[in-house]
């Protein structure tokens, strides 16, 4: 979704050798392929095997988990190579458990936390300087008078919506 794509934009600033994005929604896959053609997309079912085959060390050096489901949490650490970093961007509805016997020998580093407000100035500067282009994320625009319609579109994920901009000056 939008958080995953924004995370992708930040990852792209680091120019990694490969970026692999695991996505199950076909509209989002098309969006990613259209706007970010260097990003490799893969389905959740094929992700672990694809990551291991594509990477140099039998797994990803860094994994960012953005979806927030129990299955995606597990997939994140399973795709990580030994001694990798797994960053949790997602917010979960319930506590996740670390199946330590399954993880034994991976020596993973987990980084967990929400949005850090102290980085907002840097993020806005990156956008203003054109280093992060968020314009493709705004797929729909509505006047303030139609805010309920805009929210309904976004909430129900219709018409390929990623983000909705609301114009307040109409």
Q: What is the role of each PLM region?
A:
Residues 12-73:
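Adenosine-nucleotide cofactor-binding segment
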């Amino acid at each position: 979704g939008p958080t995953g794509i924004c995370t992708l934009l930040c990852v792209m600033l680091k120019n990694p050798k490969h970026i692999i994005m695991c996505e199950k929604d076909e509209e989002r896959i098309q969006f990613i392929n259209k706007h970010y053609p260097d990003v490799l997309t893969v389905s959740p079912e094929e992700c672990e095997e694809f990551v291991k085959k594509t990477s140099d060390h039998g797994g990803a050096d860094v994994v960012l988990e953005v979806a927030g489901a129990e299955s995606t949490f597990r997939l994140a650490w399973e795709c990580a190579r030994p001694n990798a970093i797994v960053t949790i961007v997602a917010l979960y509805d319930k506590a996740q458990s670390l199946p330590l016997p399954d993880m034994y020998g991976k020596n993973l580093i987990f980084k967990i936390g929400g949005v850090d407000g102290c980085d907002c100035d840097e993020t806005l500067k990156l956008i203003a300087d054109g280093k992060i282009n968020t314009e493709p994320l705004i797929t729909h625009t509505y006047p303030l008078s139609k805010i309920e319609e805009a929210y309904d579109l976004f909430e129900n994920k219709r018409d390929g919506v990623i983000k909705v901009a609301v114009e307040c000056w109409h």
